[in-house]
Amino acid sequence: MSEHNDAKIMKMFADVGAVVSDSHFVYSSGRHSSVYVNKDALYLHPKVISELCQLMAQPYKAEQIDVVVGPVIGGVVLSQWVAHYLNQRRQSGETLAVFAEKGSDSVDKQFAFNRGYDKYIADKNILIVEDVLTTGGSVRQVVDLVRHHGGHVVGISALCNRGSVQPKDVGDVPIHALISLSLQTYNEDECPFCQQGVPVNTELGKGRAFIARQKNQHK
């Protein structure tokens, strides 16, 4: 796994508010932390996303990537830009960009290729892109999906690895992340911010849902 948290990349994240600290955040996993990676702040700025995706594409030989796959929603943007920069370096042919979607009903929440995209996977070299790796669970689903359709996963390229996700967590696929952050997180019952009465941030993360659930529990 490549880690190169150089000052320029960290500054790009910080300048748009993509790394926020000194607050009390609740993650989608239910764990708490004082730091939050606000990936949505990046997507507001096409120039920043473009530059970051160029860096995400750099480690790969353009002719060796047939299709870039990203999970919805952020992965759609990333797959387009990364494929764009791979195509700029290709001498012939074209790198395609597709995305995987989750089932809409309450039973099927697994990723799937819709819109006929599955036809472009078999026997192809696939690069999977993701914005933030936390547990690797979503990306592992996409890896399994690509393999199910006969594709060969060359690598995973991410904006940020905040969960120390390793190749073994994602089907033994090499990981390249622009930045890697080792964030201290806590279960609710051991969270020092909860114990100190630090207000939960309701603007970022799952703070509002956490507070709503607490209120319901105390009714």
Q: Model-found features: residue ranges?
A:
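Short, well-ordered alpha-helices that flank and scaffold nucleotide-derived cofactor binding pockets
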Residues: 54, 58, 80, 84, ...
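Short acidic, glycine/proline-enriched helix-loop-strand junctions
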Residues: 62-63, 79-95, 169-180
